[in-house]
């Protein structure tokens, strides 16, 4: 009986070139592309491959973080509908959810917020690096450059197997990217940099750095 149930979770493919039948396992509405490799016209044939430009109907990975159904307008983070999060959670609460898998408790949110706001400043050499970009450089290109340069200031980030180290790198990115984005924007406008103000909340600080 169990074998019969398992066999139903499969796709039977007939290769009309050879007349052979193949049984391809189906899991969660998907088949593995490598399972098609067994379909050959001869022993020295490479095997069947899929051709799907732009991954229009190909799942590249399994995600426990995000579910998207664009046709139905569905977006979920960690199982929560995005509409619910937009109504009830702050930006940093959603960021914590994405990173840790659960919405934070009050104590966890306090620590998360404190840690991020503590790390909002960037090294002065990053500013010197930013000054090397032309006045008309696109802000996204500048942001890509200075964000990549952060790795040279934190060699400890290479220790990816240490959970505490992974946490502090997440905190640094969350803290410094708004600062870098604002600096890139102001550089492109020829404006002086507005440094972080940690008496403001996360979004307020970013808006202040951008437009003050």
PLM regions and their residue ranges:
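N-terminal mitochondrial targeting presequence
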Residues: 1-3
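Hydrophobic alpha-helical bundle cores within soluble ligand-binding/oligomerization subdomains
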Residues: 5-212
């Amino acid at each position: 009986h169990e074998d019969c149930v398992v066999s139903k979770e499969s796709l039977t493919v007939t290769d009309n070139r050879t007349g052979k039948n193949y049984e391809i396992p189906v899991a969660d509405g998907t088949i593995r592309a490598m399972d098609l490799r067994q379909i050959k016209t001869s022993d020295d044939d490479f095997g069947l491959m899929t051709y799907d430009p732009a991954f229009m109907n190909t799942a590249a990975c399994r995600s426990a973080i995000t579910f998207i159904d664009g046709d139905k307008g569905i977006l979920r983070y960690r199982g929560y509908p995005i509409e619910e999060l937009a109504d009830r959670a702050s930006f940093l609460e959603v960021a914590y959810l994405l990173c840790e898998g659960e919405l934070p408790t009050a104590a966890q949110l306090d620590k998360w917020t404190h840690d991020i706001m503590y790390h909002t400043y960037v090294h002065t050499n990053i500013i010197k690096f930013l000054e090397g970009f032309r006045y008309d450089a696109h802000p996204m290109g500048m942001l890509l450059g200075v964000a990549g340069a952060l790795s040279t200031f934190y060699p400890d980030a290479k220790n990816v197997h240490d959970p505490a180290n992974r946490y502090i790198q997440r905190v640094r990115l969350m803290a410094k990217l708004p600062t870098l984005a604002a600096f890139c924007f102001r550089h492109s406008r020829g404006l002086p940099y507005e440094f972080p103000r940690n008496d403001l909340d996360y979004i307020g600080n970013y808006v202040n750095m951008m437009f003050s």
